[in-house]
Amino acid sequence: MDSTATVASDRLSQLNSFEETMTGVKGLVDSGIKEVPAMFREPPAILASRKPPLALQFTIPTIDLNGGVVYYKNQDSVTRRSMVEKIGDAAEKWGFFQVVNHGIPLDVLEKVKEGIRAFHEQDAELKKRFYSRDHTRKMVYYSNLDLFTAMKASWRDTMCAYMAPDPPTSEDLPEVCGEIMMEYAKEIMNLGELIFELLSEALGLNNSNHLKDMDCSKSLVLFGQYYPPCPQPDHTLGLSKHTDFSFLTIVLQGNLGGLQVLHDKQYWIDIPPVPGALVVNLGDLLQLISNGKFISVEHRVIANRAAEPRISVPCFFSTVMRESHRVYGPIKELLSEQNPPKYRDTTISEFASMYASKEINTSALLRLEI
């Protein structure tokens, strides 16, 4: 066996041994590990973090939703138009923004973070009944979705639940956090519909329900990310660089930072947690149907340097885990001789296959370009 084959065999053996424990990265930390195992170690070029010069300090836009869904319909036309302009500008230039005054109660935000942490920190045997990579199940728990396909594993564990359009029952979810997950998902569905309305108007579409009518807000997947303290945070990542498959992602950050967005394809910009705020980013599917007007940008999470775990609750408006033959392409109303289609039409299932098989550090959208 040549050296390359030997390395590959050794790596597969490491991955299988790790998977068989069903305790994830937290299990490694609990065992008292002092060094990051080879399967997690990233090369320096991947870990590099180019920051903008001091004269060019950036922060992602923050948008005040003036109370969220409950108050939006009663906003005066000037306030509403201002919100649409701000969200459209952020979607075109950043692909990322934060929303405040969004209408979701602060106690709900705190309880869902506490629930996700409680799930990951409960007795390992209780978690193991959810450990699976079978995404036909309503709820699964694992470490690294792409454990066996990525070049390197990342320093995090994940729980994942399908909350819409076919919501789980209380029996499908963990007792320690199921109730708050369902409550939070309902709040996020309402907020997501509002954001899709604003984005529809920002695109200049006559119907503010246009994106909702395309089922962009129909499916919701809730993730509970747990980033344990890392003994060597300069040797690995919490989540490697990527774009999201989704139409839209709404992220609740915990108290610890770590999320970074690649701005202008050159500078890594930190997105520190803001109490009560939610981070919103656009996914590949929204870039596709907006014909590139709105952008899906790369982002990552650096390894956790703190002594306590980092919690994150991203919710994806996406059908990626549920096969769909619905066709999506650039919205016809946006096209003209001056703005011809940049992408060909595709089905969700075809695009999901492209996303899963794309080369490292590339976008699946490249394979749809005309």
Swiss-Prot record:
Cofactor note: Binds 1 Fe(2+) ion per subunit.
Residues where Fe cation binds: H242, D244, H299
Disulfide-bond pairs as recorded: none
PROSITE patterns reported in the protein's UniProt record: FE2OG_OXY
SUPFAM superfamilies named in the record: Clavaminate synthase-like
Annotated EC: 1.14.-.-
GO molecular function terms noted in the UniProt entry: 1-aminocyclopropane-1-carboxylate oxidase activity; dioxygenase activity; metal ion binding
EC main group: oxidoreductase
InterPro entries: DIOX_N, IPNS-like_FE2OG_OXY, IPNS-like_sf, Oxoglu/Fe-dep_dioxygenase_dom
Record's keyword terms, sorted: Iron, Metal-binding, Oxidoreductase
Domain Fe2OG dioxygenase: from-to ranges: 218-320
Cofactors, names only: Fe(2+)
Residues binding 2-oxoglutarate, per UniProt: R310
Any one GO BP annotation for this protein: biosynthetic process
Family: Belongs to the iron/ascorbate-dependent oxidoreductase family.
Record-given protein name: 1-aminocyclopropane-1-carboxylate oxidase homolog 8
